[in-house]
């Protein structure tokens, strides 16, 4: 009976194991997870902190006991894989509760260890990062136990923005700092102005080009020379792949510690796959490498690897489009395609339109800004971005499907919109992009 070992029990690992069991009732499947919880919703964590998700239990899909009962898959939490011997096809596992080590053999090995939050490295009792449910519980408990009021949020990526909004909605007083003037880097820089407007509207302090210089208790000294007091600091300064344990194996890592994979999510070593935040692949619509550490990619990779292991060796990954979205107070920011800093590799043109998200005479209308970049050589769409209070999500999802099917910007005129005054226009913003590009 084949033995399948999975490293990591969150989006990629747990999903892959579950899909394998759906296709294969016989194999022995075991998952090692170094942390306390398995199969939790990472994307829910800021909303648990903000008490938008009223009970943390809704963010936890399975316990190991429930997972085994439903799927006959063994999950061992607090068990960290610390080494791989790919020649003998074994992994070395550390039981983090007992500090004991043991070896586990495998026929197939699936690596989905995820990534860890970067830290600024200050020794302080008031600094936190947010990456898992344990972090969420620690933040929530600290807020309650210490009557937290003023919170410093460091960083201006998606997670930091979501955390800041949820702290504010919880009734706390957050302040945002970021080390540069480039916030929310997945979005075009000039389309981020509503983020600052939303902060100003609520009188939430923020400072760009600012960093922490020192922390002494609750006293924070900044690079600008300012000295302020905060009850809590939440750091959102990026992540790094959990690949240290892989370095002693023959598995190839790139210079940043990620694992390059082929279209079957195979590594360079036979019988070893990599999925989720640890893996790098390529874009679907252009010939460029892509690392997209988001939920859709982990789930898609999990399904493909499960099919491969179950015997369907014809299924392959066609690449990422990098579709992403974030809510920040009243606004939605969404984009798809290559990142803004990758556009310079193409000869491109940009076309954009700003108009109401639905018919102007229908109540509740607000501006929606839609922008599309296309390759001048073949007129195929490279990137699209949308910002507004309404309708950004559906326009970007439609454009994602257009890019998936290699439509040209001109063909957007043929998009048949589901039109009624509360929802759109007879000529939708997507149509207008196509007309303006001609």
Curated annotation (Swiss-Prot):
Homodimer. InterPro entries: CoA_disulphide_reductase (IPR017758), CoA_disulphide_reductase_staph (IPR023536), FAD-bd_OxRdtase (IPR050260), FAD/NAD-bd_sf (IPR036188), FAD/NAD-binding_dom (IPR023753), FAD/NAD-linked_Rdtase_dimer_sf (IPR016156), Pyr_nucl-diS_OxRdtase_dimer (IPR004099). Reduction of disulfides occurs by a thiol-disulfide exchange reaction, but involves only a single catalytic cysteine residue that forms a stable mixed disulfide with CoA during catalysis. One of its GO terms (molecular function) is protein disulfide isomerase activity. Its cofactor is FAD. Binds 1 FAD per subunit. Substrate binds at residues 15, 19, 22, 39, 42, 71, 299, 427. Belongs to the class-III pyridine nucleotide-disulfide oxidoreductase family. It is an enzyme of class 1 (oxidoreductase). The keyword Cytoplasm does not apply. It catalyses: NADP(+) + 2 CoA = CoA-disulfide + NADPH + H(+). Its EC number is 1.8.1.14. NADP(+) binds at residues 151-166. Pfam families: Pyr_redox_2, Pyr_redox_dim. This is Coenzyme A disulfide reductase. FAD binds at residues 8-33, 267-277, 419. Catalyzes specifically the NADPH-dependent reduction of coenzyme A disulfide. The active site is at residue 43. Keywords: FAD, Flavoprotein, NADP, Oxidoreductase, Redox-active center. It comes from Staphylococcus aureus (strain MSSA476). Contains 2 FAD binding domains and a single NADPH binding domain.
């Amino acid at each position: 009976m084949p033995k399948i070992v999975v490293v990591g029990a969150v989006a990629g690992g747990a999903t892959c194991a579950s899909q394998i069991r759906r296709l294969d009732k016989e194999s022995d499947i075991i998952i090692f997870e170094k942390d306390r919880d398995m199969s939790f919703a990472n994307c829910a964590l800021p909303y648990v902190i903000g008490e938008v998700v009223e009970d943390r239990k809704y963010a936890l899909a399975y316990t190991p006991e429930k997972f085994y009962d439903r799927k006959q898959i063994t999950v061992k939490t607090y068990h960290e894989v610390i080494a791989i011997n790919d020649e003998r096809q074994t992994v070395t596992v550390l039981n983090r509760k007992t500090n004991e080590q043991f070896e586990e053999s495998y026929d197939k090995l699936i690596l989905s260890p995820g990534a860890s939050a970067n830290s600024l490295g200050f020794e302080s009792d008031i600094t936190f990062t947010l990456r898992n449910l344990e972090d969420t519980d620690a933040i929530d408990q600290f807020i309650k136990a210490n009557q937290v009021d003023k919170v410093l949020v460091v960083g201006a990526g998606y997670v930091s923005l979501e955390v800041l909004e949820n702290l504010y909605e919880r009734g706390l007083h957050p302040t945002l700092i970021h080390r540069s003037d480039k916030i929310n880097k997945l979005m075009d820089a000039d389309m981020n102005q509503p983020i600052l407007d939303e902060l100003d509207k609520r009188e939430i302090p923020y400072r760009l080009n600012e960093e922490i210089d020192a922390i002494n208790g609750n006293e924070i000294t900044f690079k600008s020379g300012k000295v302020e007091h905060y009850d809590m600091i939440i750091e959102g300064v990026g992540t790094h792949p959990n690949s240290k344990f892989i370095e002693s194996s023959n598995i190839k890592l790139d210079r940043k510690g990620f694992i390059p994979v082929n279209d079957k999510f195979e590594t360079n070593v036979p019988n070893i796959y990599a999925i989720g935040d640890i893996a790098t692949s390529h874009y679907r619509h252009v010939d460029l490498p892509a690392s997209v550490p988001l939920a859709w990619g982990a789930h898609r990779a999990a399904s493909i690897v499960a099919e491969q292991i179950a015997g369907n060796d014809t299924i392959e990954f066609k690449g990422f489009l990098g579709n992403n979205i974030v809510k920040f107070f009243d606004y939605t920011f969404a984009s798809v395609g290559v990142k803004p800093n990758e556009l310079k590799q193409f000869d491109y043109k940009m076309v954009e339109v700003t108009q109401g998200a639905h018919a102007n005479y229908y109540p509740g209308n607000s501006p929606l800004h839609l922008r599309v970049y296309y390759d001048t050589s073949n007129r195929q769409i490279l990137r699209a971005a949308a910002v507004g209070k309404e309708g950004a999500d559906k326009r970007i999802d439609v454009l994602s499907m257009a890019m998936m099917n290699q439509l040209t910007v001109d063909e957007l005129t043929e998009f048949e919109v589901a039109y009624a005054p509360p929802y759109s226009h007879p000529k939708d913003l997507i149509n207008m992009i196509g007309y303006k590009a001609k």
